UniProtKB/Swiss-Prot annotation:
GO terms for biological process: amino acid biosynthetic process; aromatic amino acid family biosynthetic process; chorismate biosynthetic process. The keyword Transmembrane helix does not apply. Homotetramer. It is an enzyme of class 4 (lyase). Reduced FMN (FMNH(2)). Pathway: Metabolic intermediate biosynthesis; chorismate biosynthesis; chorismate from D-erythrose 4-phosphate and phosphoenolpyruvate: step 7/7. This is Chorismate synthase. NCBIfam families: aroC, PRK05382.1. Keywords: Amino-acid biosynthesis, Aromatic amino acid biosynthesis, FAD, Flavoprotein, FMN, Lyase, NADP. FMN binds at residues 130-132, 251-252, 296, 311-315, 337. One of its GO terms (cellular component) is cytosol. GO terms for molecular function: chorismate synthase activity; FMN binding. Its EC number is 4.2.3.5.
């Protein structure tokens, strides 16, 4: 499966086209809208979330609530477009107006300057409109479709926040993914540890008061994936590599780890690798899950556990020093409307991109065209693994 997205942050709409989604999957707009609503929540979001109420329109690939196997077109309108029709006009506008609206002061940490250099733009709005995290809206929409595939296969995905602004969750004693989801859905910062959540919100408030921003760490867990999904044969077929790329492709994400992650560098091998055990009921499994569900680029049958590091958002209300590309004079960087912390929302985006990669690998491995055949083949693999 693959998808492409199109659209600018303040353009009329965002669009994604999904290719390779198998036929026979039950898919309704409400499945996608539920995920879009989750993305818009979260402590520390900016004023734009008060303007937008994201809702999807499905324009192709679905009939009578079932996918057809043909490309699926999803569109989310930007309600704020009405205030930007002149600035973001497709047609040429008056040159004086264009000069007045030009963005010539690149923001440190953003795509502004590099994009202007690459594409030859003298107005960096041509860069920042597309590089904006607003694009993740339709990535979440794509992820919602992937989640529907996984749900049909008995695979569950859950994302949550484990750190914001140096405040780390200590309590992680949830008994199931269902409990984790129930608690984090009620948390303003999507954190299971209620005491840590309060301190996280205080850190966000402090950053906002100072015109600053803060980042954090999110974790995504996937349960129910059979062993052997992915491949050791080629670098580009390793599923953990695909998930790592997907996580780092999210706006402002700068690092990724699986299982105990970078802690593995500080431990001896005897405290890193997961011992293999066998039982008649489960077949081969692992005593621990320090590898985060992967060995050799393939799933082990244990839960996939992946974490991503999100840097603070580079748009600051107390902007850093920059240089105007026209005058070459030092100035403070441009200010765009933004969040002081988007880590809670980013956990939803991380869920979406991980779900897409896992679903895509399963569809590729177990039959690409029909959901009923994919279900049969996944169950066969589960039985085979138990009896191996």
């Amino acid at each position: 499966m693959r998808y492409l997205t199109a659209g600018e942050s303040h353009g009329p709409q965002l669009t994604t086209i999904l290719e390779g989604v198998p036929a026979g999957l039950t898919l309704l707009a409400e499945h996608i809208n539920k995920e879009l609503a989750r993305r818009q929540k979260g402590y520390g979001r900016g004023r734009r979330m008060q303007i937008e109420k994201d809702e999807v329109k499905i324009f192709s690939g679905v009939r009578h609530g079932k996918t057809l196997g043909s490309p699926i077109t999803l569109v989310v309108e930007n309600r704020d477009w009405k205030h930007w029709q002149n600035i973001m006009s497709i047609e040429p506008i008056d040159s004086a107006e264009e000069v007045k609206r030009k963005v010539t002061r690149p923001r440190p940490g953003h795509a502004d300057l590099n994009g202007a250099l690459k594409y030859g733009h003298r107005d960096m709005r041509n860069v920042l409109e597309r590089s904006s995290a607003r694009e993740t809206t339709v990535r979440v929409a794509a992820g919602a479709v992937a989640k529907r595939i996984l749900e049909e296969l008995g695979i569950r995905v859950a994302g949550h926040v484990i750190e914001i602004g140096g405040v780390r969750a200590e309590r992680m004693d949830y008994r199931s993914l269902e409990e984790l989801q129930q608690v984090t859905e009620e948390s303003p910062v999507r954190c299971f540890d209620e005491k840590a959540a309060v301190k996280m919100m205080e850190a966000i408030d402090e950053a906002k008061k100072n015109g600053d921003s803060i980042g954090g760490i999110v974790e995504v867990i996937v349960e129910g994936v059979p062993a052997g999904v992915g491949s050791h044969v080629h670098y580009d077929r390793k599923l953990d590599a695909k998930i790592a790329a997907a996580i780092v492709s999210i706006n402002a994400f700068k690092g990724v780890e699986f299982g105990i992650g970078f802690e593995a560098a500080r431990r001896p091998g005897s405290e890193v690798h997961d011992e293999i055990i066998w039982s008649k009921e489960k077949g081969f499994t692992r005593r621990t899950n320090r590898a985060g569900g992967f060995e050799g680029g393939m799933t082990t049958g244990m839960p996939i556990v992946v974490r991503g590091v999100m840097k603070p958002i580079p748009t600051l209300y107390k902007p850093l020093q920059s240089v105007d590309i026209e005058t070459k004079e030092p100035f403070t960087a441009s200010i765009e409307r933004s969040d002081s912390c988007a880590v809670p929302a980013a956990s939803v985006v991380a869920e979406a991109v991980v779900a897409w990669e896992v679903a895509s690998a399963i569809v590729d491995q177990f039959g690409q065209d029909r959901m009923d055949l994919i279900k049969e083949n996944v169950e066969k693999m589960r039985r085979y693994a138990r009896e191996f």
